[in-house]
């Protein structure tokens, strides 16, 4: 079976992740800080998932009557949480849109800022298009207006070199089991220096109001921490650029072939190399579910049809009726698997243009 749904999880883990020796939280913080180029490991807070990390971050920093800019690239879970904060605490939300290529509308940001604007909430990488946000540009705008930038990094952690100090992100939320190739059940928050006290103070009334959220901050099992540490050590062993470039090359190869097929429309910004290894397509005459069924049943290829938990992004792209078919590549995929996937798509369309496989 060929697994091309790495945007959701990594099927194959590095040797040593499963069965790793237990690790301490301090060891895991040190490695996390090193991976994300943070000076102080104590600014890392572990949770049990990326979604928990985002929830704790928003609840800690966004309060009653605040206004936030929330990108349409962010997943439905983040939007649902923001809408809950709006309904219960009067938080105001302004959607931050994208253009036809899925690129964030940076020029609109300053005109949307209000006196009560607290934060710009924006995913670092898009799970639909594979686009990566220009965080240096976004955080420069935020700094001019003294706003926080809270970013869901679940698609970029382990998929590119995330240098938090250079990017200027205030609050970076991540998961360990997607591109970082660690075990399920671990995520976290990386805070800019000076924000830890504010984060803790912001959580006090939140945990009093909803004690169940305290479970998100319960210590992570040392065995899971061990697997997580082993995954990061694997990234260091291979080199972050080596880990990132292989999937990127595979995705580029898939894109170059599919864009030559008249019946296939590819979504996203492919005019830059600053991307994650995700390619989403629409195939004329077939629904995403039909494309997926063909890939899986005839060729054993796992891709992902539908809205990918990002319905607002699909609305912005004009693909909300059926969604798209997403192919997301990982470190353990091969060129042969990409060729097989291209061939499977050619078979679906009745093509025999072998140059597409050259």
What is the predicted role of each segment?
Residues 1-358:
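Pyridoxal 5′-phosphate
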């Amino acid at each position: 079976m060929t697994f091309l749904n790495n945007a959701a999880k990594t099927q194959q883990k590095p040797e040593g992740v499963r069965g790793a020796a237990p690790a301490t939280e301090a060891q895991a913080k040190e490695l996390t800080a090193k991976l994300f180029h943070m000076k102080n490991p104590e600014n890392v807070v572990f949770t049990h998932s990326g979604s928990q990390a985002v929830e704790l971050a928003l609840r800690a920093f966004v309060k009653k009557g605040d206004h936030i800019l929330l990108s349409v690239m962010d997943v439905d879970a983040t939007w649902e949480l923001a809408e809950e904060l709006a309904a219960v605490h009067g938080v105001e939300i302004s959607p931050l849109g994208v253009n036809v290529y899925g690129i964030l509308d940076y020029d609109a940001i300053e005109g949307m800022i209000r006196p009560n604007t607290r934060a710009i909430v924006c995913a670092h990488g898009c799970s639909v298009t594979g686009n990566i946000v220009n965080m240096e540009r976004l955080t420069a705008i935020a700094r001019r207006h003294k706003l926080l930038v809270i970013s869901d990094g679940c698609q970029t952690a382990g998929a590119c070199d995330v240098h938090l100090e250079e990017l200027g992100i205030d609050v970076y939320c991540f998961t360990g089991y997607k591109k970082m190739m660690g075990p399920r059940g671990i995520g976290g928050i990386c805070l800019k220096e000076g924000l830890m006290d504010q984060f803790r103070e912001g959580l006090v009334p939140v945990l009093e109001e909803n004690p169940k959220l305290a479970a998100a901050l319960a210590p992570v099992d040392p065995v899971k921490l061990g697997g997580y540490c082993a995954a990061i050590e694997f990234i260091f062993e291979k080199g972050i650029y080596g880990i990132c470039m292989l999937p990127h090359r595979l995705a580029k190869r898939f894109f170059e072939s599919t864009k030559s097929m008249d019946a296939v429309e590819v979504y996203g910004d492919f005019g830059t190399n600053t991307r994650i290894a995700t390619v989403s397509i629409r195939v004329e005459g077939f629904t995403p579910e039909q494309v997926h069924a063909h890939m899986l049943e005839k060729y054993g290829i796992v891709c992902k049809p539908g809205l990918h938990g990002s319905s607002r992004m699909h609305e912005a792209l004009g693909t909300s009726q059926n969604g798209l078919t997403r192919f997301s590549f990982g470190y353990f995929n091969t060129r042969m698997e990409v060729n097989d996937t291209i061939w499977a798509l050619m078979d679906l369309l009745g093509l025999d243009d072998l140059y597409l496989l050259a």
